[in-house]
Amino acid sequence: MPPYLYRLPTTSLITFSAILNDPSSSYTTILSDATASRTKLHLALKGIADNEPGASALAVLDAVQIYLPYLKGIIACLDADELLFKGEPTFQWRAPLTHFSFSSPLLPLASIHSEHLMVVLTYALALSNYAHSILASLPAFEIPAGPKAMPHMSSEDEKRTTAGLARAVDLLCQASGVAEWAAENVCLQVEPLKGVSSGRLGKGKWPAESSRETFKALSMILLADAHLTAIRKLLFPVLTYTLFAPPGPPLPPNHPSAPLQAKLYLYVHQLYSSARALLSVHHQPTSSAPSNSSRKLFRSNTDKDVIEPEAVEGEIIPELKRYLAKEAQLALALAHKWLGIDAGENGKGAKVGEALAWVKDAQGRLEDLEDSKMRAKLKGLSIGKSRERKKEERRARMGRVERELEVVKAWVKAYQKMNDTVAFQPVPPVSSLVTPSGRPIFGPKAFIPPPSKFSPSRIGHLNEEQGNDSPELGETEDTSYAGKGNYF
């Protein structure tokens, strides 16, 4: 059930005073505070990785909110040559979206911009995981498949569910905006480094997280998850009707528009499909991969304790591939279901054959998802995941598919009977029908990064001399900005 639950990055400890030279001794206290804020982020991520009590995505978001302004200040001072690296810098991170044959190693990433990229990635993934935790804490409100107990909700549960769904949509839109911003800003600063490091260190590939395509795809995935959550919220008011009425025609008077739902699902399918295409753009085929001796990611004599992978192919983890394949197929099936319902309910009896074509196609696609061959194919992409987690995800997936398949079968039966007894219309092939374009109901929430905690002193002095009170220069700690306080 969307949103996807991501594994968050982890990192090693860093002491900024040990890797940075402060010629003017003006930043001693600030570097100490920056080290403390990064340590807080390290501990929050480690707590989640180790399943420690009290660890949560919310704690990670809080740590990123504190650390990011310090990191921006350090980058500004490095650009102004007020801080200098004592040697070649490496920032050790585990890449959560890159597939490795064995356990994910700590990768020594070069440049402060790589650190910035991984922190922003952590922020986007933590926002999505926080939305996931909110939805997981809500009372069950969808109708289960089969003869099971129906969910019972009090008025307080209904209010809590409505608020939780709305909050999750907002968080996912924020996460989509963060990923989109990173693709257009931070990734552009990392791109030049990849060529330099590749030539010096043996043409090793960078992890998938360093690619603009990955961040653009991630933004699409998060936006698609937000739309699916919004659809759940859209259907929530008709829950009472669907609990007691059998599936099939007619729709209740207050039911959301069938063509609207069809276009929403078509847009979701478009997002997932585009994300899958983007994630495969920068992958090279195995036959063209460099030899093992030349596929080291980053070698550094000063990082002997860092486990360096023999090969980093830049391929996305199989779990995410599996998720995209399943959700794209399911979204298209549901889009066709609602196109059929629109034709049957709003066609005034003139489009029964068309309606039957759409809902039969939806039934076929859902049966493909339920089919053992499709399940085996999807399961084969999940190697390396814990057995219990695979079972849990399979149960959740089959519950959704079975529930939708029961509903679609009811519509097929109703339209088939109508066509056999009243309409007598030919059933056209789906390929001959016109599929409308998808429709979004919102876009990514624009991300405006928080202001730097500090700025280069010479810029601050210049700002004072010119009488410029721009928040971009000098101290910006108390500056107000769009989205302030709305990180989680």
Swiss-Prot record:
Q: Which PROSITE patterns match?
A: BRO1 (PS51180)
What Gene3D superfamilies does the database record attribute to this sequence? Answer: alix/aip1 like domains (1.25.40.280)
> CDD domains, alphabetically?
BRO1_UmRIM23-like
GO cellular component: a single term: plasma membrane
Which BP terms in the Gene Ontology apply to this protein? Answer: cellular response to pH
The ranges of region (Disordered) come to: 449-488
Q: Which domain of life is it from?
A: Eukaryota
Q: Which InterPro entries match?
A: BRO1_dom (IPR004328), BRO1_sf (IPR038499), pH-resp_palC (IPR037505)
Listed A to Z, the keywords are:
Coiled coil
Residue intervals of the BRO1 domain: 2-430
| Similarity annotation | Belongs to the palC family.
Described purpose of this protein according to its UniProt entry: Required for the proteolytic cleavage of the transcription factor RIM101 in response to alkaline ambient pH.
Provide the protein name.
Answer: pH-response regulator protein palC
Instruction: Give the species.
Output: Cryptococcus neoformans var. neoformans serotype D (strain JEC21 / ATCC MYA-565) (Filobasidiella neoformans)
